[in-house]
Amino acid sequence: MDGFVLPPGLIRPPGEAPAYDAWLAALPQAVAGLADRWSLRLGPPFLPGGSSAWVAPAATADGDPAVLKVGWVHDEAEHEADGLRAWDGRGTVRLLRAHRDGQTQALLLESCRPGVPLSDVLPGPEQDAVLAGLLRRLWITPPPGGVFRPLEAMCGAWVRRFEMDYGCARALGRDQVDPGVARAAMALFRELPAAAPDSVLLATDLHHGNVLASEREP
């Protein structure tokens, strides 16, 4: 793909993750193929970009604005398309199309305009109020089929990762958290999700920088 721009956020040290390196090498061809598949005219990607997806403004064959997101499939993004389908534009952009090919997940998204991050337009306490209201809107009953990972399983994985990292840090004399506090915190990580009375859909990467102003949604 001539003139392909690779955002710096996608660049990782060579050899750190061979499968990711292969995905990144094939990314220009994947983007070009998706532009043909969906008849898109692409603009330059948003910079500096994220750490696992190439994202750029696009125009459809009808001239409608959209956004193309071509991502590396990893645990945190495994069910991104499923979540957007379930929310169907309620508190989120709408999912227009999706295509999965191996470790590449492509999403054609509604363009969010003006797209200004919440963190850029409101002071901290007001940001928190907006975020809290959005959280409640996104807490919907998960659709049937059980495709989403339960929070209990996610927290269990985080606990195991923390315990491994914390054990290594203690062995090297670099631990900065009291062992009792660490044990209590990890116990809560295990217990609270298991005791939750209701099951709702969660956005696991929701923060002030990921909430954008939109003309369609307040």
What are these regions (language model features)?
Residues 44-49:
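Protein kinase glycine-rich loop
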